[in-house]
Amino acid sequence: MTALDIQISVEAGDWPPEDELQSFSEVVLEAAADFLAREERQPLSAEAAELSLVFTDDQSIKAINAEWRGQDKPTNVLSFPAFPVTPGKMPGLMLGDIVVAHETLRREAAELEKPFDAHLTHLLVHGFLHLFGYDHIEDDEAERMERLETRILARLGLSDPYGDLPPV
């Protein structure tokens, strides 16, 4: 399994304790990295690649979203790759940053009738794929990214977030 050095920062919001977020995130992102290495032949280029996770609130992510994407509203997750990478290529030692907003995550989980942890898992996987160059701007890119998310989540015992299919 690939080693990830995950730095956690709880900036704002009613998040679980930092040590719980750390161990939870390690399980999720190690599974995603292992999947990409084995199934997509996109391994990390270093023994221990680094990324940071920022757990924050809607107010903070709204400001980040406005500054970096020109959208003056909160969103669930934002990813900032350290370096440009395209799907199928190996990322460098520094992967980048993933920022998750608590209120949006909780609201979406309730609307989707999904457990908070399941939706957080999905958003972490989604953000992680962005660090590897995957995107969802074009329909074909979105379909590929959704398939990858679904397969990674299935490995973690979670159902398809885009449908009602049970885990494979």
UniProtKB/Swiss-Prot annotation:
Subcellular location(s) per record: Cytoplasm
InterPro entries registered for this protein in UniProt: MetalPrtase_cat_dom_sf_prd, YbeY, YbeY_CS
GO molecular function: metalloendopeptidase activity; RNA endonuclease activity; zinc ion binding
Enzyme class: hydrolase
Catalytic activity, EC: 3.1.-.-
Gene Ontology BP annotations: rRNA processing
UniProt main location, coarse: cytoplasm
Annotated positions binding Zn(2+): H126, H130, H136
Keywords: Cytoplasm, Endonuclease, Hydrolase, Metal-binding, Nuclease, Ribosome biogenesis, rRNA processing, Zinc
Cofactor note: Binds 1 zinc ion.
Pfam families to which the protein is assigned, alphabetical: YbeY (PF02130)
Cofactors that this protein relies on: Zn(2+)
A cellular component term, taken from the record's GO annotations: cytoplasm
Family listed: Belongs to the endoribonuclease YbeY family.
HAMAP family for the chain: Endoribonucl_YbeY
Its job: Single strand-specific metallo-endoribonuclease involved in late-stage 70S ribosome quality control and in maturation of the 3' terminus of the 16S rRNA.
Xref: PANTHER family: ENDORIBONUCLEASE YBEY, CHLOROPLASTIC
The name this protein goes by in its record: Endoribonuclease YbeY
Naturally occurring in which organism (per UniProt): Sinorhizobium medicae (strain WSM419) (Ensifer medicae)
